[in-house]
Amino acid sequence: MSFQQVVRVPRDRIGVIIGKNGKVKGQIQDRCNVLIEIDSKTGDAIISSQSKEMSAEMEPFKAVEVITAISKGFSPRRAYRLIDGDDDAFQLIDLRDYAGKSSNSMERIKGRIIGEEGKSRRTIEDLTGTYISVYGHSVGIIGTSDQIKIASDAVTMLSKGKSHKSVYNMLQEAKRKAKIDRMRLWEDNNFPALR
């Protein structure tokens, strides 16, 4: 079964996807068992695979996610988490849903998500275990589905004008709850007779 998909890449991100001497493109091709052709005039990245192996079924989709993530502002190193982590996924949030057509509103929302010297973005990343990129009119998030859900809620709250303090409190509470859930799971698996 052959696979082919086109991903539109902004011109300023084509060089990042190719990498120095084609290194990044080559790594994605090798790790995902795909062929990548990039048209620098149109910005189209054509990802194709001819593999018929069952284990290779998901690899072309991972390549699509990695290239999409890099095209939305992630560094290749951070985007490789999508290949390395079996449970990791990529989600894109369109900020136009909150800012409308106003460029001033868009800049204000992006500023709230990034924070002063990137503090807000780093705090969300640290408390959720995700990677976050604010690029153009979108926010990209890489992490597990649970991590993405919490980070997405934080981005949505900030986009709707909630205070940073209330967002950080929500993140702290979610982190505390996740820790308790992990401890309960560990106890249930290691001490079933105590229940």
Task: Locate predicted features.
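RNA-contacting regions in translation and RNA-metabolism proteins
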Residues: 1-195
